[in-house]
């Protein structure tokens, strides 16, 4: 039998089902496919309950000749003694759900001016940077959805799926159906 080396990540889950960005990958010991592995989850923090975080989802690496990804293997309640048993067999207990929150970055420190757009996107800013959330996921602000302006931003106004960005210099109009398709153009008027 071939030895297997697996990597694991965990995400926090709130009582509303909101799922966080994953932890850094942790390498599990190399095991034979028929062995079981007991994972000790040491992310417990008393303050988690203040944010409604009640569970952790565990994902395991699965590789093929074309790609590597993390697949869901289970969910555990958060408490000081959380542990999780998983078997080494690559086909055992894989729910098939691929980790989808890898780019769910926290809102940037100092983010302000939060504005809801009609497409479910929340926009905000800090300094010269305009930030956009994942649609309908207002706690996930992927870094790749940040767009810089030439001058410091002073305010935002939503108009449907458009966003007017007021700066200390020239205003901008941001347009896009989703956060990943946002483009901007200067409005040729001094503020």
Provide a role label for each language-model segment.
Residues 1-126, 138-144:
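Disordered, low-complexity "stalk" and linker segments at domain junctions of extracellular
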């Amino acid at each position: 039998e071939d030895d297997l080396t697996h990597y694991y990540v965990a995400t926090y889950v709130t009582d509303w089902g909101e799922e966080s960005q994953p932890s850094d990958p942790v390498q599990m010991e190399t095991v034979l496919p028929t062995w079981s592995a007991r994972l000790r989850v040491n992310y417990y923090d008393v303050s988690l309950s203040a944010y409604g975080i009640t569970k952790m989802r565990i994902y395991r690496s699965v590789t093929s000749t074309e790609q590597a990804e993390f697949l869901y293997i289970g969910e555990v309640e958060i408490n000081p003694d959380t542990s999780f048993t998983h078997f080494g067999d690559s086909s055992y207990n894989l729910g098939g759900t691929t980790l989808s929150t890898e780019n769910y970055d926290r809102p940037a420190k100092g983010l302000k001016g939060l504005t809801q757009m009609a497409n479910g996107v929340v926009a905000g800013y800090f300094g010269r940077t305009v930030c956009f959330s994942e649609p309908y996921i207002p706690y996930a602000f992927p870094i790749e959805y940040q767009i810089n302006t030439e001058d410091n931003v002073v305010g935002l106004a939503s108009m449907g799926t458009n966003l007017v960005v007021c700066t200390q210099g020239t205003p901008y109009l941001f347009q896009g159906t989703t956060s990943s398709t946002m483009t901007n153009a200067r409005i040729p008027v001094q503020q």
